[in-house]
């Protein structure tokens, strides 16, 4: 590096002349006699003692000794990694970056592009790690900064390959097929049609050819119920309908849309958006009257992809039933980076009403879907619903969305059907209900007449088959309407119709896997029940459930007006037997009861193949309790071991850590091979935090380390949950 210094003198008669009278400067460094400046560049490290002399105009001299030290230069800072190893979707990933030169320690940062949801860059180590369900190629620029503030960067492509995780998880069959929804999977090689503000969107939709892209002017509003016609397109020629904004102004593929992109910096009582800009870059579609729209897919519509749109309703009095609606057998649709929303106090029944096959909903944001209790025209509201009708349904992909619905955030079933939707992937979504929808809360928001919105649960399956629910965060559910604040319901139902009819004798809920999820702020956990319809009709089936590695945090029946129970397991007389249910490695802290059990043995017989293992559960005041019905209920005596022996055959209940069992329910009242702790502190969690917002891993000193029947710690694998849910909120 260039070097510069200057010698100085005082006294005598100027001007001065400088010279070396002893020693030598390193090669490349020189003393300027007239100025006393020392400068140059050298490649010779070492210590150089010299003696310098100054002579004034009268000939007087003075000398002084110095030592010039030359330090070997650090190598130039550089990123030495040349590529990132490929990743597989839904498989844990870890890759470390490397650099040389500069001064350690290094800090790493992402300077452009984005990693797929579920992946993160650890700044101190330069490690990219996590689990993503999103396949595609993600270009990123990564920068290393050394301790001296020097920077170096390099560009990489992280390729995530799709995986078909088929087979079984415990008793439950996983989806047999998964939708590939990357942009590269939906080519549109045709012409571009631009529709400016005031233009005729319906005409553009009618006239577009397969492979065309329809660009809607960013910032413009298009009012109407727009029909997306059937065109008989194919996998090589999609029709894309999108904002005219450049891709660089939108969230990158695989990154969730937020209202920021419509110029909205925040919404009350929702998580912060962290906007980098509030420029409106979306085109807006508005339904002007009561009904379903503004997006309506005609029967046979196929191969459409929607990108960068705000989809909503007008301010009319009345109900908007579905903002996106399918009239018949639509197929191959992708809803990508959209904001779908109702208005703060209206009735908007649902965002997307699913029907048809091969439909993906990705990276989108759903808000303000609600029905008004007591006086409303609709009874249930959801962000996404499906599972009704007489046409094939599924596969469906619902990943990386913010999902807000008052009654259920997602529901499959609850209507007349002769078919069952199958192969449903629900991953890495944030299910959310604003707490301000709860009457009595500060900032309460209900209907204009003051009535609250109807709230039931976060996820309900009444008609669905081969469902994977993985890596989601589910926030807020409370009771006070027809349910008790449950988070998730697996309740196959033959819905009742008029005049004593039953609408869905073929309805079933089978092969459901719920894993690596975080549930928070709820009144109760799971309701798993095979019950008859109001007209006494039985469903087809309800069985093969695998629930594992789930944390239920802040389960508070008092605050959320719920039952504060972990799980209800029940069968009503005449319904199919509940069987093949595994609940393993779950952590939850109910205050009332662990299990609410019911089966009428005279008509149903015991539930079969129940496996409840390796969980950490507080047992509550009434640990294992009957659902009612008198002595005919197998759980009538309300004693754990007695109830299990009567209600389940065969069953396994072992390896569980049971917290707070009172003297009324000693260890002898439970099956053997379980462990008991008088309180949460003696379990020795890393941080119990009252069962709300804690770290429920076990400390190394915990007496319960490795006590699961599989040799692992009981309770949910929090590291796996944190990895699966990284970036979800």
Which residues does each predicted region cover?
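Right-handed parallel beta-helix/beta-solenoid
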Residues: 162-207, 218-220, 240, 245-249, ...
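Beta-solenoid repeat scaffold
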Residues: 182-187, 210-217, 223-284, 298-307, ...
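Extracellular beta-strand/beta-solenoid scaffold signature
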Residues: 236-239, 281-296, 317-327, 344-355, ...
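Right-handed parallel beta-helix
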Residues: 238, 302-313, 330-343, 357-372, ...
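Predominantly extracellular beta-rich ligand-binding scaffolds that present long acidic/polar faces
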Residues: 536-539, 544-695
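C-terminal accessory segments
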Residues: 675-729
